[in-house]
Amino acid sequence: MPYHPPVKRSGEIAGHKTSISLEPLFWNLLREAAARDGLPLNAMIARIDEERIRAQTPPGLAGAIRLWLAARQAGRGASQ
């Protein structure tokens, strides 16, 4: 798989404008997860952000999204 640098996208979470840099693979996985859950992309990101800020040592938002997606993929693999 060829390497693609991160792509920065802007959005709004809890009334605050923010930008997130993720590799295209993660953007694609995040869009798929949002579609499966019937959520707009910003709502999915907000959900992950809410989980992130409850952590004892919260990671950055981009890292939290990557970790959330990896955990979701691992969970789906275990159930298949």
For each predicted feature, which ranges?
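Surface-exposed, Lys/Arg-rich phosphate-binding patches that contact polyanionic backbones
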Residues: 25-37, 46-54
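Amphipathic alpha-helical interface segments used for dimerization/assembly
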Residues: 34, 45, 69-73
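Short Lys/Arg-rich basic patches
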Residues: 2-21
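Alpha-helix N-cap/helix-initiation sites
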Residues: 19, 41-42, 55-62
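C-terminal structural segments of small proteins and small subunits
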Residues: 57-80
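Short, electropositive, low-hydrophobicity segments enriched in small/polar residues
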Residues: 19, 23, 64-67
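Basic side chains
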Residues: 8-9, 17, 31, 52, ...
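N-terminal, well-ordered alpha-helical segments
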Residues: 28, 43-46, 63, 67
